[in-house]
């Protein structure tokens, strides 16, 4: 709920800007934040998965853990981002790996879920059916944690087991990048 409310406030703030540079700065910050939330957290999850698989076979040294870290981060970052030896121990600063293992996926999941909901909201506004979306959204908030997420998403015609759900969420990020690039 808080991330959806953030998006409402963010969109209002961006849309109220009359200066292209202000819009650009806001959009660039939001895109960076969204990419960090989705791409970075998935990379963290991949690290945890690889780490635990390797640990199931043998005890690992800090250097071996750092090797796994570098391998998974380079795979996520691609060739455009260069990581040096100073990046090797960074895994040690992420408390989730110790205190709440395998939790980081929730950040990426939550962000993509909200992005998909936001896209549905935008479509509802465009088709003048936003009152139905708002009613469903209020019911979602009222339900709190009493419904499983898959049941709750059905009210919005969303199914997280389908690739289209994830594409919808990622398309929002792509659209925001396009909007940012369109500001000359």
Model-derived segments and their meaning:
Residues 4-8, 12-16, 20-21, 30, ...:
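C-terminal, non-catalytic "cap/extension" segments appended to globular domains
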């Amino acid at each position: 709920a808080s991330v959806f409310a953030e998006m409402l406030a963010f969109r209002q703030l961006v849309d109220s800007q009359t200066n292209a540079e202000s819009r650009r700065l806001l959009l660039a910050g939001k895109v960076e934040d969204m990419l960090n939330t989705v791409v970075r957290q998935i990379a963290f999850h991949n690290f945890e998965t690889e780490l635990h698989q390797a640990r199931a076979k043998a005890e690992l040294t800090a250097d071996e853990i750092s090797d796994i870290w570098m391998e998974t981060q380079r795979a996520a970052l691609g060739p455009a981002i260069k990581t040096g030896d100073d990046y090797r121990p960074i895994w040690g600063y992420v408390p989730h790996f110790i205190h709440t293992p395998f939790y980081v996926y929730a950040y990426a999941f939550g962000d993509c879920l909200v992005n998909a909901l936001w896209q549905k909201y935008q479509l509802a506004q465009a088709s003048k059916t936003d009152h139905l979306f708002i009613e469903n959204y209020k019911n979602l908030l009222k339900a709190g944690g009493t419904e499983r997420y898959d049941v709750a998403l059905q009210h919005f015609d969303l199914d997280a087991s389908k690739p289209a759900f994830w594409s919808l969420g990622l398309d929002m990020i792509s659209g925001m990048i396009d909007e940012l690039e369109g500001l000359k």
